[in-house]
């Protein structure tokens, strides 16, 4: 299969990317895209348009650091190395002209939306097979909803700012500069509707040929619809029923499509498990191109073996959120004194070979598997350390999140102690090696969600704190890390001290619940209004 990257009818010439299979290297080959008059003629044209949906995954500002600068505001993470603009974001002092790489997300998602609208505008009237037509229309609905779901939680609200401008295949060209809807609920309703349409048209995952692994399917559409409904429920509790409905569709799948929790959390995030029973939807890459996020998570400099960037590091608050015996803690966070293998070398963290290069004294290890082998560079990770693409899928939603979303909807809509919510949370706890003793309280749900999903690109701990109404209190507390003192004879760690590494911050829930829309987007629009307070 050739996976060509096509940037929409508005851009007629682009470097194409072809992907022969999910594990093979990407081949780069240029092609000139004819104008729209000559383009929408054949199934091959449609396939090129569908392949173009994946172009955003290769942008460092989108799937590298991108929205992680906003997640860096949470109490799970601190900026792992000096970065003034990042500190402004974390301290809720950013301007509309800042945003670091995150500002690239807004235009990238509207480009994705435009591509989806091109398909929805042109494909229905084409003389092609119904199978190809359904595939194309289903994927277009999926990626249009996907684009809005990437933006809505970070930039939209139910007042005073409103939602994200809605542009569909029916929006006249003269009216593309749409004003914002009065509420972000208009976006969430559209996302749910689009994902419903996608689910109706797309195949089940089991029906995908292996060369199409990574493309949308029914369960992925339903899962993102559930996430949109969960985010909408902070404004209107009726959406909790929608969350439960979509989660049940996934939970009740049978046969080859039945989803489950992969038994060993410590080995979940490995290439061989990219499409295990826990998979719902990820963005794929390889050693030539793809998402770069994983390489941002290890300490700066990669122990002299690979130039990882070290921008996001775990807090002691996150480390302590895990209960004693929780296997997720040591599978997520590398603590001084523990060992990992990195590019074939045994790293006794904090002791050899180059100590600790992290603000918090710890580093994330959740996504380190692609870097373990001595032969990893050029095979499982990009040889260019400024482009840390790798073979591990960048998880955006997995089955554990589906269980947690349903449990949350049950607790918030039917009350703490809900029997079904207990069972769902205990499934999560059992896999983590913990007693199955959840009482399904709101506090327990929040902590299970924090520990299970820590540092995954989506969903966002910061957005969770905002929608729960917990952000102001959480961010009023300082954050902590650790300082390691080695024995004078060089034989190991003498002692570890807890230290404050980030001062308390002022979070104004009337302003900081959303981020400023990039000033470049405001300046090129007559109708787009800035979020208040920025």
Question: What role is predicted for each listed range?
Answer:
Residues 132-138, 208-220, 438-439:
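A glycine-rich, coil/turn loop motif that links secondary-structure elements
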Residues 47, 51, 55-56, 83-155, ...:
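Conserved, well-structured interaction surfaces
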Residues 1-32:
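Bacterial Sec-dependent N-terminal signal peptides
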Residues 21-22, 54, 78, 82, ...:
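Long, intrinsically disordered, low-complexity segments
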Residues 324-398:
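Flexible, polar/acidic helix-loop-strand segments at domain edges
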Residues 23-86, 156-164, 188, 192-197, ...:
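An aromatic- and glycine-enriched ligand-binding surface/loop that stacks and positions planar moieties
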